[in-house]
């Protein structure tokens, strides 16, 4: 069975069709437009809780964090690194703004610093949402073995 020329051409066109990925937009604005916006215009795009926080003004500590992130990004671009250096912080209540995209932030969870790479999808969220303070506990069933596990077990397990 021979394939006709037009059918073959359409089959090749379908096979070579490149996948197009959806560009990120936050409330209808792309990342470049978000970077150019002032804080007042940007606050209008956020939900009520974040908007209220922006209107009350950014304090000294969040501004220092943004300054450190700028410096880390600049050093990474000067040295042609793929990722900027990790900037550690305890500011879990910091709101992620477009200027932070591409940065690596170490957010303290009470025990250690969890590294977070800031992506465009994270805009408007708090840093704490990406650094969990507690982990899921895996409970194991009590078991009897030849070592000291038997003495530590608090449950009665009948012998067979």
UniProtKB/Swiss-Prot annotation:
Keyword Plastid: no
Lineage top rank: taxon: Eukaryota
GO BP, sorted A to Z: translation
Family annotation (PROSITE patterns): RIBOSOMAL_S19
Entry's localization field: Cytoplasm
Pfam family, any one: Ribosomal_S19
Primary localization class, coarse: cytoplasm
NCBIfam families linked to this entry: uS19_arch (TIGR01025)
Matching PANTHER family: RIBOSOMAL PROTEIN S19P FAMILY MEMBER, SMALL RIBOSOMAL SUBUNIT PROTEIN US19
Family classification: Belongs to the universal ribosomal protein uS19 family.
Entry protein name: Small ribosomal subunit protein uS19v
Annotated organism of origin: Arabidopsis thaliana
Gene transcribed to yield this protein: RPS15F
